[in-house]
Amino acid sequence: MKPLENTIPALNTAAICERLKQVRIQVCGTRGQSHFAALLHLSPSTYNYYEKGRIPPVDVLDRAARVTGVPLLWLIRGEPTDFSLESLKKIDVPAGSDAGMVSANGTAGV
């Protein structure tokens, strides 16, 4: 029997970060990075690290999946391959809100 580590394919960090970015652009638009970070309960700078190549923890990926409706396995592995970003609902990003906190239901925080 082969050791377990030889049977599990390595994660592609760059691909995970790129899929997370694609989801953010699809649901919040190109200027919605801070808004999307707030939806994930992250600071904009922490979220930016994830888009720039630092692998997000599983709880962040899970939150992104729950908030957007993206399959978690798609974020991690790109499966199922028939998943389409176009099926995601857009989240309205209030004008000038790219620095404010927003709750998961899309309402502005206080």
What residue ranges belong to the model's regions?
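DNA major-groove recognition helix of helix-turn-helix
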Residues: 51, 68, 76-79
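Interfacial/linker helices and their anchor residues that mediate assembly or domain coupling
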Residues: 83-110
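Short alpha-helical DNA-recognition segment
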Residues: 27-49
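A short, Lys/Arg-rich alpha-helix, primarily the initiator
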Residues: 1-29
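DNA-binding alpha-helical recognition surfaces that contact promoter or target DNA
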Residues: 18, 22, 38, 49, ...
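DNA major-groove recognition helix of helix-turn-helix/homeodomain DNA-binding modules
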Residues: 59-74
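The alpha-helix within a helix-turn-helix
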Residues: 24, 37, 65
